[in-house]
Amino acid sequence: KVLNKETAPKAHRPERIIQFGEGNFLRAFVDWIIYNMNQKTDFDSSVVVVQPIDKGMVDMLNTQDDLYHVNLQGLDKGEMVNSLTMIDVISRALNPYTQNDEFMKLAEQPEMRFVISNTTEAGIAFDPTCKLEDAPASSYPGKLTQLLYHRFKTFNGDKTKGLIIFPCELIFLNGHKLKETIYQYIELWNLGEEFKTWFEEACGVYATLVDRIVPGFPRKDIAAIKEKLQYDDNLVVQAEIFHLWVIEAPQEIAKEFPADKAGLNVLFVPSEAPYHERKVTLLNGPHTVLSPVAYLSGVNIVRDACQHEVIGKYVHKVMFDELMETLNLPKDELEKFANDVLERFNNPFVDHAVTSI
């Protein structure tokens, strides 16, 4: 049957999150995290999705009343998992290129608190051709500055109406880059010292590091999945079980975003840098170590390399005896992360080609 709010129950929750991006990653990572927070804590929030470019999936989302399923596949502490969960956190999805008034009105909603984005690595960029009166500005930071300025004016600079901003773009210190770009727009558009002070004191832009492999729409399994669900869901998104979100922000922000109370792997830390280094060393490092050896041995899939009698032992030894020694984080934390990495490499559902590394 069709998937919409008539055929599937959908809770009505306050709109507190604006999300720039409607792609597979945000829907299988951030929206899945918010779903779990709604289920297990008093977070009680829904998401308004904003399509960051003029072409996207907003119409498809709205056709299904913004409902879709996440299919998690992989090993969890050695156990095989293949689960399907209906995600109901998106209240509506907007295209600012055709619905700019509705987009700007989001700034007028007093209960709005968070902005989350994934607009690709190229998304956080300054475009000097953007104008304040553009409907909307072409760049993501331009749109965000328009929204923030409208909120500032709507609430007469009320410091309690600031927004907490979590960029998820795959750029090291993405929050710093986004903040820098917003300052460039404040200057370009002459938005004034009062607004600049409000932005600095009432809002927070925090660097984050995201980690979850999201293969996306399960083309080869979709018929079986629809049969199992009994819904015609054209927005199913597949992801691995492992998830990690490191947010460089103070603990009072963690209180407002209580992911830890939902048992999620979301960390609020004073510095993202050691976690970035850990990921590069213990995830990308072993990939680099195993790929030439596996390739020359005629082993084509990462999982098969890890299960190979010689290559598997070699990778394990390099990870635990050499790479780990270079990192300045608690040993038990590093060992857990390394074991999670090996479990991810062994995921029976993901055929990760050695040559793609």
Locations of the language-model features?
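Substrate/ligand-engaging "lid" and interaction regions
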Residues: 1-357
